[in-house]
């Protein structure tokens, strides 16, 4: 029977929690004025590298998102040192931050579906209204 949760997945899950706490309590960069959420962490099999996926509250401005990712990338050494103190790992992985737009895309798709359903309901209730124009 194969392991459902291997060590990289367990470490990634714990690392996601720890990075979220660090970003909330320790990072005071003004470029991260918006609230930052860690949406996921992917670890390499040897635990030497970690991809950290983040989302930002008020992420409408693309320049602010780029500045936020750059600020996180520049603070990755500091975050890594705090991770080393918080987690018992022989090697603290090298962190790379990425913007996760899946939440934004999911909301956009949900809005599209809602609009289509609403439009379909309107046409079903008033089928003759569209022919009168």
Swiss-Prot record:
User: A Gene Ontology biological process annotation?
Assistant: maturation of SSU-rRNA
Q: Where in the cell is it found?
A: Cytoplasm
Main location as per UniProt = cytoplasm
Under the heading SUPFAM superfamilies, the entry gives:
Ribosome-binding factor A, RbfA (SSF89919)
GO CC terms, sorted: cytosol
A Pfam cross-reference name: RBFA
Which GO molecular function, any one, fits this protein according to its record?
ribosomal small subunit binding
Keywords associated with the record: Cytoplasm, Ribosome biogenesis
Q: List the cysteine pairs that form cystine.
A: none
Q: Which InterPro entries match?
A: KH_dom-like_a/b, RbfA, RbfA_dom_sf, Ribosome-bd_factorA_CS
Q: What does this protein do?
A: One of several proteins that assist in the late maturation steps of the functional core of the 30S ribosomal subunit. Associates with free 30S ribosomal subunits (but not with 30S subunits that are part of 70S ribosomes or polysomes). Required for efficient processing of 16S rRNA. May interact with the 5'-terminal helix region of 16S rRNA.
**Quaternary data:** Monomer. Binds 30S ribosomal subunits, but not 50S ribosomal subunits or 70S ribosomes.
Q: Which family does it belong to?
A: Belongs to the RbfA family.
Name of the protein in its database record: Ribosome-binding factor A
Q: Taxonomic lineage per UniProt?
A: Bacteria, Pseudomonadati, Pseudomonadota, Gammaproteobacteria, Enterobacterales
**What gene is it encoded by?**
rbfA
């Amino acid at each position: 029977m194969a392991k459902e949760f291997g060590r990289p997945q367990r470490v990634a899950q714990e690392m996601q929690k720890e990075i979220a706490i660090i970003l909330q309590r320790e990072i005071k960069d003004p470029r991260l004025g918006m609230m930052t959420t860690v949406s996921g962490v992917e670890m390499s099999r040897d635990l030497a590298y970690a991809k950290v996926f983040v989302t930002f509250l008020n992420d409408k401005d693309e320049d602010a998102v780029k500045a936020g990712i750059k600020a996180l990338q520049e603070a990755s050494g500091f975050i890594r040192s705090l991770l080393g103190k918080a987690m018992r790992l022989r090697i603290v992985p090298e962190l790379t931050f990425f913007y996760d737009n899946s939440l934004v895309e999911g909301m956009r798709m949900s809005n599209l579906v809602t609009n289509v359903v609403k439009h379909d309901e309107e046409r079903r209730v008033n089928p003759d209204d569209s022919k009168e124009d």
